[in-house]
Swiss-Prot record:
Catalytic activity annotation: a 3'-end 3'-phospho-ribonucleotide-RNA + ATP = a 3'-end 2',3'-cyclophospho-ribonucleotide-RNA + AMP + diphosphate
InterPro entries membership: RNA3'-term_phos_cycl_insert (IPR013791), RNA3'_phos_cyclase_dom (IPR023797), RNA3'_phos_cyclase_dom_sf (IPR037136), RNA3'_term_phos_cyc (IPR000228), RNA3'_term_phos_cyc_type_1 (IPR017770), RNA3'_term_phos_cycl-like_CS (IPR020719), RNA3'P_cycl/enolpyr_Trfase_a/b (IPR013792), RPTC_insert (IPR036553)
Organismal lineage: Bacteria, Pseudomonadati, Pseudomonadota, Gammaproteobacteria, Enterobacterales
Annotated organism of origin: Escherichia coli (strain K12)
EC numbers for this chain: 6.5.1.4
Listed SUPFAM superfamilies: EPT/RTPC-like, RNA 3'-terminal phosphate cyclase, RPTC, insert domain
Activity's dependence on pH: Optimum pH is 8.0-8.5.
Record gene name: rtcA
The protein, known as: RNA 3'-terminal phosphate cyclase
Record key words, sorted: ATP-binding, Cytoplasm, Ligase, Nucleotide-binding
Length: 338
């Protein structure tokens, strides 16, 4: 019997990332775990619908035995079974992030006995989670370089706080892993601004695009009007295509916050990314830790190692026989496997 791994959910940033990473790694390695103080660092600690959906999805995909899988629970015991490929559908029942549920179960399906399709309904444009377009346009091309083949499709938008969106991913088992090297992003090739609107006046998008264009030379400026019943909602994105990587940054509009202020938040984030030579932004760095660890080698550079990133690395090192190295030089941190 494999040893039980004990995790403290209050570790590091004290959010849901510890639980999501632990579920992924437990399914992959077969190691059971217990976690206490789940989301202790959040205003509403314990399992919310999004986290409970991730637990139930993991349980179904590998036939796990679970204790503590209920709303508000701050303790969970998870004993994984065998990961099975197949066609899965999960509903969050709120505007909780579809992509974070997918992030939990897809790594296990890289090791399944056949191809899979996972469909999740809930929130797609959530201020605290990467949107589907980020997964599709930024993360998945990098996963393909590592040898991981999955394809995400946004079937319907669901803005926070209403939800109602649907995201699906098709994934194949990994034949072999390759090493990812992302030391520098290289010169910028082009930048693209995009605004999504649902049940929001078009002039909001025009003002947001104008704010972006006032700070950056945009190769493309796109405004997409979605059906009113998918809103109300508004998301502003800016994609930075460089020689070695494409990064994408986003901000979700809020009620009683002007279009100019919303877009200015995005401008600030992109300028911070461009101020260094680092290849990877803060959100993407979080996503690369697990696939890189599974490959057993690789590196990337990031300007600002987040608490999320450090917490994720700590959890990965509990389950896998790898050690990460973080070396800071001239404001850029090189993250690699020793």
């Amino acid at each position: 019997m494999k040893r039980m791994i004990a995790l403290d959910g209050a570790q590091g940033e004290g959010g849901g990332q510890i639980l999501r990473s632990a579920l992924s790694l437990s399914m992959i390695t077969g190691q059971p775990f217990t976690i206490t103080s789940i989301r202790a660092g959040r205003a509403k600690p314990g399992l919310l619908r999004q986290h409970l959906t991730a637990v139930k999805a993991a349980t179904e995909i590998c036939g796990a035995t679970v204790e503590g899988a209920e709303l508000g629970s701050q303790r969970l015991l998870f004993r994984p079974g065998t990961v099975r490929g197949g066609d899965y559908r999960f509903a969050i029942g709120s505007a909780g992030s579809c992509t974070l549920v997918l992030q939990t179960v897809l790594p296990a399906l890289w090791f399944a006995d056949g191809p899979s399709r996972v469909e999740v309904s809930g929130g797609t444009d959530n201020p605290s989670a990467p949107p589907a377009d980020f997964i599709r346009r930024v993360l998945e091309p990098l996963l393909a370089k590592i040898g991981i083949h999955q394809q995400t499709t946004l079937l319907r938008h669901g803005f926070y706080p209403a939800g109602g969106g649907v995201v699906a991913t098709e994934v194949s088992p990994v034949a072999s892993f390759n090493t990812l090297q992302l030391g520098e992003r290289g010169n910028i090739v082009q930048m693209r601004g995009e605004v999504l609107l649902a049940g929001v006046p078009r002039h909001v998008a025009e003002r947001e695009i104008a704010t972006l264009a006032g700070s950056f030379s945009l190769h493309e400026q796109n405004i997409h009007n979605l059906p009113r019943d998918q809103g109300p909602g508004n998301t502003v994105s800016l994609e930075v295509e460089s020689e070695n990587i494409t990064e994408r940054f986003f901000v979700v509009g809020e009620k009683r916050v002007s279009a100019e202020v919303v877009a200015a938040q995005l401008v600030k984030e992109v300028k911070r990314y461009l101020a260094s030579t680092a290849a990877v932004g803060e959100y993407l760095a979080d996503q690369l830790v697990l696939p890189m660890a599974l490959a057993g080698a690789g590196e990337f550079t990031v300007a600002h190692p987040s608490c999320h990133l450090l917490t994720n690395i700590a959890v990965v090192e509990r389950f896998l026989p790898v050690r990460f190295s973080l070396i800071e030089t001239d404001g850029v941190t090189r993250v690699s496997i020793e």
